[in-house]
């Protein structure tokens, strides 16, 4: 007897049934590897399997050699026969089969034909009931009712279009082709991969959609947890291609803000395709924590609200990545019905929309009109890297709805970061390309590029009116012949920021403006335009060279500052300036503060404007109190009073109203604007080398009296003086002071007392400031045109005091007195002749002398 061989104990090696599950050969499906790397991995893995197999054969040969050489052949035969008779051999076979089933069972094992004719529903049901992973091989497997998926189901096919599961023509209404078993409370742990679901909607006739609720979709997942759907194709769907929803056959409508019970959650949909659907390709309702990536939804059967991807009522925390849509109403529609909560907290990371009507459509129906309640749930959408190609409505979706690249309605908290819209046929979209409308709020559009929409009215339009959008930021936009109005803002939009807009409009049909706003308070900066006749139109005013507008607190070129009001500014300043009230500002100053509205400090230090309408310029340590007070080049001074101004001064304090003051450590001069008075502490000088004091008098005959004639009074008016008459003065052109001109209005415009003094009344301003002003004469008509006395021929400047040029005859001598004949001075006893400047000329009939009139 030979020695019993030392047999080697082999460890079990990995599952290798690549024909069933890619998970048994994971490297072949590792998308990070190149094709060559995948093939090398597979060859290496198979070589390892071959080594193990060869070793098994060698060890088995050792056993057989031992049996034969030691005469154990008969004993082995007897043992095998006994096992067979006792049933142990059958048990071994069954055990092996059961172990093989762990790798998966084929529906054909349970009688499925896959011939496109035979009803294979029972084979599917038995295979699924076995509890083992189920494999659907090549073929078309007809079913007479929907396939139910219990928890812990694994269903894998030979690939899209290779393994096809299809409704038979005899199937009635209300059936979904595949759905989880417990439609109310749901199931868990379902894995679906690599087959086609054909709803065979043609069996129902043309134009047929779902009968209601979530019924009649190709794949319905209701109230399920942990579902993985990969490489599934849904075609010819009565309702949806793939529908992820909550428990129940009917979608719940519990009101805005009310979440439905039993949501589906932790759902993964990858590399799937939907086409020929009656409603939506891939859709979600009342579910959460969903990922949809690398899917394609296209070409629906019908023309209603047929969306490629629809994130609908009550969906939340959904991420869509790198998907594609074509020929649908909405490429991606994120929405809700009026009596359901809106989808919220949705993220879109890359999408390509080709020839959809509205590539990206975000809305909460029933919350758009001014009389509708504001949506409480339509919030938080972030979408990046969106592509829209040739949006159009050639098929007439939704009663010929107008195409859009993007439409946002009723949502708030929407962020678009990277959106490109392109068309090569400008006639496909002629209204608005991108719209924020119907009470949408707090939306941000950044990085938008539109090209080719040359017949469109608006590139980007924030629609105004009673149900318009608001709080919109539009930035970094490039418009290439897209929109007669590049960016347009409607009426009533209170909060909008428009920055860095670049537009070319030389290929547009009648371009108007790159940016247009109805209201006057937008924030605008960084506009660049070619081909638009107007760069910016704001509240009806055109700006052809660009425009920059800022709202809110503003600080620039300032190292530090205190509080700045939302309607205040600080520029070019240092050391803790504050503009803490509305409509106030500080320029190129330090340690200064505005504490009342409509106040300004510029070029100053340690100054404060505490009253409204105050101004401080070029001053140090200046304070302006009350209203309309100001200091200009006035340091260590305080202007207290209404309409009080200090100029070029140091160390003075002023009170009162409607005054202009100046001085050094004390007030030295004052202009009283209210009463027209001038005060000075020292000398007031004139500009002429000889000056006189004069008043206006009216001529008796209304005619002009020429310069240099002596005049007398006659009936309160003047005429040329004659010999022996009282001379009151001379017609003068050298007066340093002239009274009685009535320069600005009729001398009777205000009431006067019997002594000619002005009658005053006390008035109080809206801000409570009291002051006196002249009482208007009720007979005065301010609408009548007034001509001052200086422009009327009958009024003359009569020098009454001073050194005045007088017409003389040949009798007048220097140092002697004068009298008058016909207004010409002759020898006499009045006044004194200072000097004769022009000797008497017989031809002219007079000379000229300077006479001291007093």
Curated annotation (Swiss-Prot):
It is found in: Virion. It comes from Bacillus phage PZA (Bacteriophage PZA). Mg(2+) binds at residues 285, 310, 312. Autocleaved to produce the 74 kDa gp12* assembly attached to the phage particles. Autocleavage of the C-terminus is a posttrimerization event that is followed by an ATP-dependent release. GO terms for molecular function: ATP binding; metal ion binding. Structural component of the 12 appendages that hang from the lower collar. Adhesion protein that binds to the host cell surface during virus attachment and mediates teichoic acids degradation. The lineage of its organism: Viruses, Duplodnaviria, Heunggongvirae, Uroviricota, Caudoviricetes. The N-terminus has three domains that function to attach the appendages to the phage, digest the cell wall teichoic acids, and bind irreversibly to the host. The C-terminus is an autochaperone that aids trimerization. Keywords: ATP-binding, Degradation of host cell envelope components during virus entry, Host-virus interaction, Late protein, Magnesium, Metal-binding, Nucleotide-binding, Repeat, Viral attachment to host adhesion receptor, Viral attachment to host cell, Viral tail fiber protein, Viral tail protein, Virion, Virus entry into host cell. The active site is at residue 695. This is Preneck appendage protein.
